[in-house]
């Protein structure tokens, strides 16, 4: 191969250098701004071996089955952060058993958080008086639909909440929320 003398090699002019620098800066800023937008459309990865989202307590800590069962009595329904950050009731079914389903606490009428009323043994919406039985089935309107369900699983003492895709056992129909 022959080498070209240095005088024959074209150099990068000041204008070309500034154009390259400007293009690189604008591209970097555009990619930085588009990353969160693109990331929004990518579904979150499943956590844990059983899949789903790790249930979080009111402080944002992951819920463990042993810790939850030691501080909650049988029949208790208490809120955790579930799918998409929605408040979800975990149900204690026995001394050492968390229920296989959770109940989304968002009212199907106007989206209020529905508290559990242990005295009446039902969920009662404070906004417009809708009532749901212990399984989240609507028993009194104006709410048109039952509360959404979520699968609850325990894997290595960690509690996970995942999308409910089975038939709604309360109505025998396909879930309205999936």
UniProtKB/Swiss-Prot annotation:
Cysteine pairings via disulfide bonds: 112-127
UniProt membrane topology term: Single-pass membrane protein
Cofactor(s) in the UniProt record: [2Fe-2S] cluster
E.C. numbers: 7.1.1.6
Catalytic activity: 2 oxidized [plastocyanin] + a plastoquinol + 2 H(+)(in) = 2 reduced [plastocyanin] + a plastoquinone + 4 H(+)(out)
GO molecular function: 2 iron, 2 sulfur cluster binding; electron transporter, transferring electrons within cytochrome b6/f complex of photosystem II activity; metal ion binding; monooxygenase activity; oxidoreductase activity, acting on paired donors, with incorporation or reduction of molecular oxygen; plastoquinol--plastocyanin reductase activity
Keywords, sorted A to Z: 2Fe-2S, Disulfide bond, Electron transport, Iron, Iron-sulfur, Membrane, Metal-binding, Thylakoid, Translocase, Transmembrane, Transmembrane helix, Transport
Annotated positions binding [2Fe-2S] cluster: 107, 109, 125, 128
One Pfam family of this chain: TM_PetC
Further comment found in the protein's record: The Rieske iron-sulfur protein is a high potential 2Fe-2S protein.
Family: Belongs to the Rieske iron-sulfur protein family.
Function in brief: Component of the cytochrome b6-f complex, which mediates electron transfer between photosystem II (PSII) and photosystem I (PSI), cyclic electron flow around PSI, and state transitions.
Alphabetical list of NCBIfam families matching this protein: Cytb6fFeSPetC (NF045928), PRK13474.1 (NF010001)
Protein's name according to its UniProt entry: Cytochrome b6-f complex iron-sulfur subunit
Organism name: Synechococcus sp. (strain CC9311)
Name of the encoding gene: petC
